[in-house]
Amino acid sequence: MQHCLEQSDITQYQQYYSSWCDARALGPRLSPVALSLLVGRNEHRLSAEPEVHRSQGRCVGVEVPREDINYLSTTCKPEIKSRNLKEDSEDQGRLPTRLPEIMLVGSQSFSPGGPNGIIRSQSFAGFSGLQERRSRQVLGVSPGITRAPSKDVYCKPGYACRVEFLLCKAFSKQTCNSFIENASALKKPQAKLKKMHNLGHKNTNTPKEPQPKRVEEVYRALKNGLDEYLEFHQTELDKLTAQLKDMKRNSRLGVLYDLDKGVLYDLDKVDELYEAYCIQRRLQDGASKMKQAFATSPASKAARESLSEINRSYKEYTENMCTIEAELESLLGEFSIKMKGLAGFARLCPGDQYESMDGPNPYQRQQGEVYFSLLATRRIGDGSCLSKGARIFMKYGRQRWKLKGKIEVNGKQSWDGEETVFLPLIVGFISIKVTELKGLATHILVGSVTCETKELFAARPQVVAVDINDLGTIKLNLEITWYPFDVEDTTPSSGPGNKTAALQRRMSMYSQGTPETPTFKDQSFFSNLPDDIFESGNAAEEKRPLSLSFSDLQDGDCVFTSSSTTSPSSSHSAHPEITITPAELTHSSLSSQNEGTEDSSSASSRNSLGEDHEPKSHSKSDTVEPKKPSVDARSGTESLFLENSVAEALLQESDEASELKPVELDTFEGNITKQLVKRLTSAEGPITTNKLFFEGSVGSESEAGRSFLDGSLEDAFNGLFLALDPHKEQYKEFQDLNQEVTHLDDVLKCKPAGSRSRSSSLSLTVESALESFDFLNTSDFDEEEEDGDEVCHVGGGADSVFSDTETEKSGSVHPEARGHLSEALTEDTGVGTSVAGSPLPLTTGNESLDITIVKHLQYCTQLVQQIVFSSKTPFVARSLLEKLSRQVLVLQKLAAVSDENLGNITSVVEAIPEFHKKPSLLSFWTKCCSPSGVYHSSAAHLIKQLEASFARNINKDYPGLAEPVFRTLVSQILDRAEPLLCSGLSSEVITVFQYYSFLTSHGVSDLETHLGQLARQVAMVQTLQSLRDEKLLQTMSDLAPSNLPAQQEVLRTLALLLTKDDNEVSEAVTLYLAAASKNEHFREKALLYYCEALTKTNLQLQKAACLALKSLEATESIKMLVTLCQSDTEEIRTVASETLLSLAPYSGSAMTSQIRQNYSTEVEAAVNRLVNLHLRASYTYLSLGFFFDPDDVALEGNERGGRALFQDVQKPSQDEWGKTLEAMEAALALEKNLNQALLDLHALGSARTDPHLCDFLESHFLDKEVKLIKKMGNHLTNLRRVAGPQPAQTGVAQASLGEYLFERLTLKHD
């Protein structure tokens, strides 16, 4: 073995040998070279290693006898007390100069080898190029170099190795970064470094594309650095202030004061810039969404003009962001980088061969003592020592630093440049490349790496150890100091500087007052409305009409005049009524009011509009005179203005621009914003002034469209497909449902864009745009209140997308009643999410039809889940499948309606032709639904109509039961497990198909007759619920099973009585159900209802159903109870288990033992719970076993460094296996599944080029699995031969004599 050593090193090593090892015991047995290998390093010299002296390219060294290495590894285990730093520094003078000093602290958390393994360096300070990135993890901050004592190892013969002792002082329990902090922050040198010609400035051109994510990262890092700087200097300032009395001069104190003020100034400036940047970023996002929405909306002249304006605004926001980035970059300070040298380290690498020495590790870590272990390092020759020299090239944006260095024979390094300055950049990383110089034309790339810079913003200098090559054997040591000040202003006086200053002046608006809402200029689709449109006060006040007129405003500027004499009563109107009228109507109807109420401010408003403003025509025959704003001082009516071009844009495509009629927005219809957007953008038909009432209806109600919609059409389709896909081949009904749903989805996706309502398209524009500007609706609107008139000219602003007028009121207004149009328009307008990347939602063009489809899709999803849960109980699944079949027919009708473009039908008969055969039911539904939505009605509205039509008759026969009866009917129509609460009626929707399907399936032709029957059930239920315990017991004992109908409400009440704490009541109900179960009709209906209740999500009802099935002795429900035993709720699992055990004696199964006596089911259930607890505890202890071992790598058999991660384990699919043949079939299927999983893992390992895994599976598992499957197959064949014939008339498996002999004679000895 060869080791490159200098003769002077051997002499020095021999001098220290007596300090660490007893020379009298070891000295005579070691050669001089082996003696030299015992020399360690001082603690702060840990990373320094002996240089390899090369002479003419060949290693000059001496032989190291193998026996010396073996003897050292087993015998020499010296230990010494650690010396203080002063002694170390004295000893350092007698040693030759080595590589630069780097403090290194170990890390255990990132150690791949563990405390007992040989650990490589993990001090990666960056990420390298593509070739090295494949085998190295990307780390911004290095976790440090780890050296820990390990088992004694040595190299096998044939490899040139170095053997050394490494100092370890319990380093493996510590953690550090590669950024080493000194005790105090270095002060900026007085003489500024001379920057290189290409380093003294940065790119003066602002970036073309903003980088928001990177700006946020750098902002956070810069802010943390400034905070740290401020904290450090304030600490020193407080220290000097305390010592001020003892000081004659306080000049240093003044310097700290200046630094403190400078840091605070920079912090404020950085925060202001970042806030402005965030605003511009959000404006850019909003403009981007507007571009998408307008690009997909129907083409028109106004739309094209608006799109052009959006593009201009988007470009300006982008330029503003780039300008702010450049300004922020100038506040980043500077990085002072000092070259500390290159360090080479030897490492154990993949491919090196070594073996561990047997025997326990004799070392024990104790505080204050130093131990040594023998470590065999990797072979030499990979660039660990650079003989000729090295060239380092650093690149940071457009900044460059090239330096050349040489490593002398004695290990001293000399570099032609030791320090430089880099100006930090927002975008970009520091790229470092190191090249070894072999000759004049021979250069070898040692490695290259790219380093993150955001961690360098720190108050104290940091020493960074950068791994240059992939193995970490070459490190570049740099000392980086960040100075946040003294950066010359390199921004030129012209160009971007002026724009930055102007931008800062504009951004000051955001910090000093109310933020301006973005606007389009004169061609926008939506203009401003005053804040108090949505004001509401006392409900007793009358509706206040607000006139919304189209007026001709130049450049989109809005002028609003507020009356100082507004009455308080008008300010608190309860239900504002918004009327949209053309300008000529406003002029004719309000001219007298204008004359009496106009003041000087309104006159100035007229002047601001321009005297020679030309009117624009709505059509060829009609012209609109420019109108003045008007205020009605008596009623508080305020005129709202929209641009005339908006009116043209909204009416041109509907061919109704010649006749514009006023419209009232009704507060009964729900959200006023949705109505406003719908009216402003609707092109479906003419709009009338009067409210539309259906004859005989309780009130006009469209329910604000999608306010009832729980999710969009896309969500409903996705949810149903997700529930249906795994089981769609299980039943024919599932296949039919999948076919119809797919057809309906295709119909909606294939509908042309023109068939979709324009209101939906443009409402999406409002939604997607105004939601982007939510951040502008701050509380600043409440901070500034002025009397008189306010004139705003924001329409012409080039840096905004929409404009919102800031309206101030002089009257007393309730704070919660104050609203802002942009905030109101930001609410959900009912437009769904996009599909397939398109901003247009999936829709039929009719909101009522959309709601109907969503409700039926959601109900189908619920039915599919219930059918899957009850699939092992045929009679329950059959009942649910019948319901699903009816829903398939409904979806078929919905697809036909959507495909034939009948979304705007106004008659229910067109959707359900069979409805004309039941005129009473049809007449009642037409009273419940509104003309805008014939497909659905709210539950609250339906109940109101029921009360208006049938409440008198119901209360006459059953006083006070009308409302419970109506709520029970609604819950049955919706197929709910229990009656709806009064609070939830307003959010529930009933579709016309649900209404018709329920009544026809129950044979109802007259609604009043059905309500009378339902009232009798409700009366009986309330009687049972209201009785005291004694009376209830008497009633239950007197009731005959034939006198109590097996209806849903009665059955539910009886089951809930079983959950009472009173044992006597529970026992009485149990006895009644047991007696009633003898009635076949009652038992059939009760069994079906309670089994279906097990599939519901109501936990209380599930528990009650279990107890009821227990009372009915319903063995038919055993399989459903077994499934319920796997519930996530402990209480349900317990009740289901007890019910299952109680049904065992009646099932005639093998669970009933003939020796069972005095062994209650409750005790058996408790024993089973204990058994399962022990089983889970053993599973948990298995996991804890891996935790208590400190390192998984040390586990026997874990050759790859993996981890054991446990998953939930389900119970076996059945508790009884019947006869031996069935059990063997189940075992064979289990082994086949296991073998298939092994084959899949083998295929994955082969695809990932993992030969070790493939070989491991082939040699240990796959061969054994094949043999086992073969043997089980043979047993199964023999079992089928010896098993006797199964009697056809019995449903219980009977074991034959052949099976018995096979078990005893064959399986017992196998």
From Swiss-Prot:
Its main location: cytoplasm. Residues 224-253 form a coiled coil. Acts as an inhibitor of the small GTPase RHOA and plays several roles in the regulation of myoblast and hair cell differentiation, lymphocyte T proliferation and neutrophil polarization. Plays a role in fetal mononuclear myoblast differentiation by promoting filopodia and myotube formation. Maintains naive T lymphocytes in a quiescent state and prevents chemokine-induced T lymphocyte responses, such as cell adhesion, polarization and migration. Involved also in the regulation of neutrophil polarization, chemotaxis and adhesion. Residues 588-639 are annotated as: Disordered. GO terms for cellular component: apical plasma membrane; cytoplasm; cytoskeleton; cytosol; filopodium; stereocilium; stereocilium membrane. Expressed in the cochlea (at protein level). It comes from Rattus norvegicus (Rat). GO terms for molecular function: 14-3-3 protein binding; ferric iron binding; identical protein binding. Residues 588-608 have a biased composition (Polar residues). Belongs to the RIPOR family. It holds the Pfam family Ferritin. PANTHER family: PROTEIN KINASE PKN/PRK1, EFFECTOR (PTHR15829), RHO FAMILY-INTERACTING CELL POLARIZATION REGULATOR 2 (PTHR15829:SF2). Phosphorylated. Chemokine-induced phosphorylation in neutrophils occurs in a PKC- and AKT-dependent manner, resulting in RIPOR2 interaction with YWHAB and stabilization. Phosphorylated by PKCA, AKT1 and MAPKAPK1A; in vitro. Homooligomer; homooligomerization is regulated by RHOC and leads to the formation of concatemers through the association of N- and C-termini. Interacts (phosphorylated form) with 14-3-3 proteins; these interactions occur during myogenic cell differentiation and also induces T cell proliferation arrest. Interacts (phosphorylated form) with HDAC6; this interaction occurs during early myogenic differentiation, prevents HDAC6 to deacetylate tubulin and also induces T cell proliferation arrest. Interacts with DYSF; this interaction occurs during early myogenic differentiation. Interacts with MYOF. Keywords: Cell adhesion, Cell membrane, Cell projection, Chemotaxis, Coiled coil, Cytoplasm, Cytoskeleton, Differentiation, Hearing, Membrane, Myogenesis, Phosphoprotein, Signal transduction inhibitor. Residues 196-254 are annotated as: Involved in cell filopodia formation. Residues 609-631 have a biased composition (Basic and acidic residues). The gene is Ripor2. GO terms for biological process: auditory receptor cell stereocilium organization; cell adhesion; cellular response to chemokine; cellular response to mechanical stimulus; chemotaxis; establishment of protein localization; muscle organ development; negative regulation of cell adhesion. It is found in: Cytoplasm; Cytoplasm, Cytoskeleton; Cell projection, Filopodium; Apical cell membrane. It comes from the Eukaryota. This is Rho family-interacting cell polarization regulator 2. The modification Phosphoserine is found at S123, S178, S508, S682.
